[in-house]
Amino acid sequence: MIKSILDNDLYKFTMQMAVLELFPKAEAEYRFTNRGSHHFSEEFVEKLRRVIDEDISALMLTEDEYQWLGENCSFLKPMYLEYLKNFRFKPGEVEVCLTEEKELDIRIKGPWHSTILWEIVLMAAVSELYFTTIEKEWNGKEWDGNISATSESILTAYGEKILEIGKILEENGCLFAEFGTRRRRSFELHDQVMKTLLQIETLTGTSNVFFAKKYGLKPIGTVGHEWIMGTSALIGLRYANRFAFENWVEVYKGDLGIALTDTFGSEAFFKDMDLKLSKIYDGFRHDSGDPFTFVDRVIDHYRKMGIDPMKKVIVFSDALNAEAAIRLKKYCQDKINCSFGIGTSLTNNSEFFRESPPLNMVIKLHSVNGIPVVKLSDSPEKETGERDALRVANYIVGRKGLDE
């Protein structure tokens, strides 16, 4: 299910290193949110607990993985690699239960640098367990997770679907990376996706470090919302974007230069993205809101700064499929460079699995040092955080009045 400590997204490791360097004593809490209508069971909770206690807790960096990171991820410092070599997941940091309403409740508490790696592995485990214990029928066939004729036929058919998607992206010149670990249907299906995508020339890499190593691909990723969210608790929300991205430069010296724009809404972001930061960062990542409006806003920002947009890039990562990527590629043509991070559409495709759609879930940072944090986003349905904290945050960034 989770095969390696590297079976995780690159940006969890890069953020872990930054937290260790700048905020080593910070305490964090994360919480799970089920945005969909899927239901869970006591049996599911017991199996998830077992995966946490027995499987994930046993993961450790191998010598081979340690050497590979040193050779292929030069931005990870030797001191951090030594830390990771000794890192072990602590099951006691994770609480799992069903509420009285039969909703799945997951809470992760502990040092920020320690708890930061749980998010992706837990989401991948939740998704795979759901589709092997609750919704076992995949397109009318029961998946058993073993090497059987039924499982092989599903994998083969899914590979054909992914190859079709990849060829469409390739024919339209769309540079893209695979971003689908967190909501994948199963590890085996994810592996099939990666094997298939090796045939596609416009594949730039994968966010999953394990598969990057296995298939000789570039690990892709920079920073997530939690870096900015955590900064807001430790330094203050009003200037969180600026401090977060200046601190990122301090740690990575220009490496990993894609800035995430929507943590507190893109307008607040662009106010903080001054000339220095706009020059240092290679581009911006779009993760919510209208992407076409965003393209125009980014181009306008660069032009006002006297920067040629054709020397910068937008990375699109908001619930993308091939059709959306192609439309955006055409819109950006001769205006600004673009690439795409495509996730669930590759690792749990809803067109292929028509009768059992992927889970709509997130695990987000809830507080740092006991201070609630929020994500405002450019899409209202993606807001996360306590109601009062959201109200104050929207007021501070100028989006709403205190009583709205």
UniProtKB/Swiss-Prot annotation:
Keywords: Ligase, Phosphoprotein, Pyridine nucleotide biosynthesis
GO CC field: cytosol
Coiled coil (residue ranges): none
Catalytic activity annotation: nicotinate + 5-phospho-alpha-D-ribose 1-diphosphate + ATP + H2O = nicotinate beta-D-ribonucleotide + ADP + phosphate + diphosphate
Xref: InterPro entries: N/Namide_PRibTrfase (IPR041525), NAPRTase_N (IPR040727), Nic_PRibTrfase (IPR006406), Nic_PRibTrfase-Fam (IPR007229), Nicotinate_pribotase-like_C (IPR036068)
Pathway membership, UniProt: Cofactor biosynthesis; NAD(+) biosynthesis; nicotinate D-ribonucleotide from nicotinate: step 1/1
Transit peptide recorded as keyword: no
PTM info: Transiently phosphorylated on a His residue during the reaction cycle. Phosphorylation strongly increases the affinity for substrates and increases the rate of nicotinate D-ribonucleotide production. Dephosphorylation regenerates the low-affinity form of the enzyme, leading to product release.
Protein name: Nicotinate phosphoribosyltransferase
Organism: Methanosarcina acetivorans (strain ATCC 35395 / DSM 2834 / JCM 12185 / C2A)
Gene field: pncB
